[in-house]
Regions:
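Alpha-helix boundary/capping detector
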Residues: 70-78, 149-153, 157, 166-170, ...
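Acyl-thioester-dependent condensation/acyltransferase catalytic cores
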Residues: 45-135, 139-149
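Acyl activation and transfer enzymes in specialized metabolism, enriched
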Residues: 36-55, 125-142, 212-250, 394, ...
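Short, charge-rich amphipathic segments
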Residues: 22-36, 69-80, 155-164, 168-178, ...
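Acyl-thioester-dependent acyl-group transfer interface
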Residues: 1-65, 88-110, 247-422
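Short, charged, solvent-exposed linker or helix-capping segments at domain edges/interfaces
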Residues: 83-84, 153-156, 360
């Protein structure tokens, strides 16, 4: 009898699984890559299959028992992973491909759909968020494009890929015992969460991803403004989002979730496996704060976020969960995860720069690429940002009514209008 290979589920995997169980989001990541010509489908299929050596969980199903959770190997062919849709209405097909659902319990954990017109292709990829965060997804895309390029050049190409570490333990191992104690005992000195009343009704049967772009000139202007005001681009994004929420809801008090990448704690020469290495901080704006100008709002945002950026307090929940999952039963650990991990209903995630030099598909020019997060269920609301070739894409995702989706599209435009000009 053949032994089934299994891989332990990390606490962060379980955390995302719980989010889907509790109807917060569908725990999928999404990307659209737009090319100037046709991809080689058979080469793409080979590349995806080879990439599973680096991330074997792609070809697994998730299994929970009373003893724990794991990823168990399944058998999938390339035809289960990559699909081709030939069409004269590419926008419609891209929208449909973007909202496909993966089956966590059955697998596979990735879906690639090539939307083909007579002259060009768009590649839509959906990845289970349990496997990777935004940075991990970019890491996977770079790997996929590299394998595709090498296989296109040499169809017999093969390489032995090592999965690497997926656990948060690799982050905590960087801290001496004294700092680990500090992580456990450091409490966030933060006001209670204030969720602004976003007017979303929700419709579980009507998912949609909405995105819009700014010009290179407008984004360059935003970067220049951030530098002049000793702020990060992320600070400017948060100020624009806070002002837009204030404009559309009339509320000043708000809490906006901000994911932070924990890879910064790893040695520079270490590349982790493709995984989730993210914690959360919160941008807090009080009812007494004055949001009368962009500059004032930026100052308030910086005052809230700056002390948290390098604070170990953000790691506390994740270190606690690592310990609980090690020492307690799975049932207790899962309940603890559900109780300890609670973030504001409104969030902004800056997935960051998609590196055009690392994302190269041989013989095809990549005209555009953006990544967006999971499809939310009301009242959860998120805006995501990515940049590619100096162009910014803002996106928002929701299982919602047509009225909800119109409201979200309008929100993105209002947010862009808040961007400062230099």
């Amino acid at each position: 009898m053949t032994k089934i290979t299994s891989y332990p589920a990390e606490p962060s995997d379980v955390k995302h699984f719980i989010s889907a169980e509790n109807m917060k989001n569908d725990h999928h990541l999404h990307t659209v890559l737009t090319f100037d010509n046709h991809l080689n489908i058979s080469t793409l299929k080979k590349a995806v299959q080879l990439s599973a050596e680096k991330l074997p969980l792609l070809l697994c199903h998730f299994k929970e028992t009373s003893n724990g959770a794991s990823w168990q190997e399944s058998v999938f062919s390339a035809d289960d992973l990559v699909f081709l849709v030939e069409t004269t209405t590419p926008d419609e097909e891209v929208n449909q491909a973007l909202v496909k659902k993966l089956s966590t319990e059955n697998g596979p954990q990735i879906c690639l759909t090539v939307i083909r017109t007579k002259t060009s292709d768009q590649l839509v990829i959906i990845l289970n968020h349990m496997l990777a965060d935004g940075a991990g997804f970019k890491q996977y895309l770079y790997l996929l494009s590299d394998l595709y390029s090498k296989l296109l050049e040499n169809p017999e190409y093969h390489v032995k890929l090592s999965p690497g570490s997926r656990g948060l333990k690799q982050v905590f191992d960087q801290f001496p015992r004294k700092q680990k104690h500090e992580i456990l005992t450091k409490q966030k000195n933060q006001s209670p969460v204030q969720n602004p009343k976003i007017p979303l009704q929700g419709d579980a049967n009507n998912p949609r991803i909405i995105w819009t772009k700014t010009s290179k000139q407008q984004f360059a202007s935003l970067i220049s403004y951030a530098k002049k005001h000793n702020a990060t681009v992320n600070d400017v994004f948060f100020a624009a989002m806070a002002l837009t929420i204030h404009q559309v809801t009339g509320q000043t008090a708000m809490s906006i979730d901000c994911p932070v990448d924990l890879r910064k704690y790893l040695p520079k020469n270490r590349t982790p496996g493709i995984t989730n290495l993210t914690a959360n901080i919160t941008c807090q704006i009080a009812a007494t704060d004055s949001l009368t100008s962009f500059e004032e709002t930026l100052h308030i945002v910086k005052k809230s976020l700056q002390p948290q950026k390098n604070s170990l307090a953000a790691l506390r929940i994740y270190y606690l969960l690592e310990i609980i999952f090690q020492k307690k039963s799975y049932a207790i650990a899962k309940k603890a995860s559900e109780k300890l991990y609670s973030i504001p209903k409104t969030s902004f995630t800056n997935i960051g720069i998609i590196d055009e030099e690392k994302l190269v598909f041989k013989n095809s020019y990549l005209q555009d690429c953006f990544i967006c997060g999971s499809l939310k269920y009301a009242p959860f609301f998120q805006v995501a940002a990515t940049t590619f070739r100096g162009e910014l894409t803002l996106s928002t995702n929701l299982h919602g009514t047509s009225h909800d989706h119109n409201w979200q599209a309008d929100f993105l435009q209002k947010m862009i209008q808040q961007f400062p000009q230099t």
